[in-house]
Design a protein with these regions (language model features):
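Short alpha-helical segment of the dimerization/phosphotransfer core of two-component systems
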Residues: 26-31
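Conserved catalytic submotifs in the C-terminal HATPase_c
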Residues: 54-55, 74, 79-89
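Conserved micro-motifs of the catalytic ATP-binding
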Residues: 46-51, 90-93
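Short beta-strand/loop element within the Bergerat-fold HATPase_c
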Residues: 116-126
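A conserved beta-strand-to-alpha-helix junction within the catalytic ATP-binding
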Residues: 52-70, 81
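Short conserved segment of the HATPase_c
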Residues: 139-151
Length: 196
């Protein structure tokens, strides 16, 4: 485990304290996030995940999600290109949980994009579809059927909890989520009911 190795390096006096502390803090944040995701998925399994639904313009939530990943976007040299209609798209959702789901997919997209991430939003009379597409290498075909499975790590080596939790959040909103490969990169599509 990286935290233990860096802490032992500091203790033995063989590592630079500042850079080792930075790695320890980053890994601690990652572990905290993983524990929170595991707790939330456990609450969903037990039927204890209470959602606070309110009506809102989904475009505002999407802009908030873009702002949440902005530091990573800037440091990685990635551009997020939003494409939303001018008129409001009203949905009933748990603002915090839905933002978490969208931000998770955006964060993944930023990680795998080469230069650009497209975020589009379209609505018909019944549903709003949110599409997030990166310009990376896409998802390995062997991983696609399992991308939302709990603990499935695939070639990325990540914990396999984030996308599973995202799917559960979308399902709690009576929506669907799917992943596929587009002409360039991975495409994630979320569909949830509109409220009016």
């Amino acid at each position: 485990m990286a935290i233990q190795g860096y802490a032992e390096g500091i203790q033995a006096g063989v590592m630079d304290t500042g850079s080792a502390a930075e790695v320890i803090l980053e890994e601690s944040d990652r572990m905290t996030e993983l524990v929170e995701e595991l707790l939330d998925i456990s609450k969903i399994d037990m039927g204890r995940q209470l959602l606070a639904f309110s009506e809102m313009d989904i475009r505002e939530l999407l802009y908030d999600s873009i702002r949440a990943v902005e530091p990573t976007v800037v440091s990685g040299g990635i551009a997020i290109v939003p494409d939303f209609p001018e008129e409001p798209i009203m949905v009933k959702c748990d603002d915090m949980q839905m933002r978490r789901a969208v931000t998770n997919i955006l964060s993944n997209g930023v990680r795998y994009a080469r230069s650009e991430l497209r975020l589009t939003c379209r609505a018909d009379k019944r549903h709003v579809t949110i599409r997030i597409q990166d310009d990376g290498d896409g998802i390995a075909e062997v991983d696609l059927p399992h991308i939302f499975d709990r603990f499935y790590m695939g070639k990325s080596g990540k914990s396999g909890i984030g996308l599973a939790l995202t799917r559960e959040i979308i399902h709690l909103h009576k929506g669907t989520i799917r992943a596929r490969n587009g002409d360039t990169g991975a495409v994630f599509e979320i569909s949830i009911p509109v409220s009016r």
